[in-house]
UniProtKB/Swiss-Prot annotation:
Gene: MOSPD3
The species this protein was found in: Homo sapiens
Membrane topology: Multi-pass membrane protein
Subcellular localization: Membrane
Alphabetically ordered keywords of this record: Membrane, Transmembrane, Transmembrane helix
Domain MSP positions: 33-145
PANTHER family on file: MOTILE SPERM DOMAIN-CONTAINING PROTEIN 1, MOTILE SPERM DOMAIN-CONTAINING PROTEIN 3
Protein name: Motile sperm domain-containing protein 3
Length: 235
């Protein structure tokens, strides 16, 4: 088939020879709208179950109609239920399968024709509609399809910084912990020293008067020492 010129090809389908071919006269009498969905057929060459489409044909009238599916390239397609009847105010699904999904057929436009006629062997055609069909190439090369994806390498947990950043973060934390420990230790030593110093009115002390502490200072030192003890016990 020549690309882009499906109108130059003869429509072939079931039925007597010559019926529904190129140059067929328009339907006589009342015209029935041919309602189909989708309006165009797009096949994908990489469909897992094979390139196929479901065409739904509606009959909006109050009488049963005979339908027939014609195609410009019948060798490339298989049409299930290419001819039959549609009940009044009902619909029927027609499965169309592309049987030649080869690279030379990619982006080649074909044409289907849906004809509706009255019941009976010689029923006159009351409506027809042409729809285009095209085969799209696979989204990925065929040689890459079917191959399992390589197993992803296990990475660090979410929220975990890279090793370099983590290395720089651990050092400040260690330094902060060391500084806090030294501060607590120094505060504890000072508190113990305050508790060991004599009161101002204590007799027999050989320390100078400046090293005598009040009872309030001893209470504060005891309170601070108790807090430090609780911190050490929790850690």
């Amino acid at each position: 088939m020549r690309r882009g010129a499906p109108q130059d090809q003869e429509l072939v389908g079931p039925g007597p020879p010559g019926r529904g071919s190129r140059g067929a006269p328009p339907p006589l009498g009342p015209v029935v709208p041919v309602l189909v969905f989708p309006p165009d057929l797009v096949f994908r060459a990489d469909q897992r179950s094979g390139p196929r489409q479901l065409l739904t044909l509606y009959n909006p009238t109050g009488t049963a109609l005979r339908f027939r599916v014609l195609c410009t390239a019948p060798a490339k397609y298989t049409v299930f239920d290419a001819e039959g009847y549609v009940k009044p105010q009902s619909c029927i699904d027609i499965v169309i399968r592309h049987v030649a999904p080869i690279p030379s057929h990619y982006d080649v436009q074909d044409r289907f024709r849906i004809e509706l006629s009255e019941e009976g062997a010689e029923g006159r055609v009351v409506g027809r509609k042409d729809i285009t069909s095209i085969l799209r190439a696979p989204a990925y090369p065929l040689e890459l399809q079917g191959q399992p994806d390589p197993a992803p390498r296990p990475g660090p947990p979410a929220g975990t910084p890279p090793p370099t950043a983590r290395h720089f973060q651990e050092h400040p934390r260690q330094q902060l912990a060391t500084s806090s420990f030294l501060l607590f230790l120094l505060t504890g030593i000072v508190s113990v020293a305050f508790l060991l110093l004599p009161l101002p009115d204590e007799l027999g002390s050989q320390l100078p008067q400046v090293l005598h502490v009040s009872l309030g200072q001893k209470l504060v030192a005891a309170y601070v020492l108790g807090l430090l003890t609780m911190v050490f016990l929790r850690t």
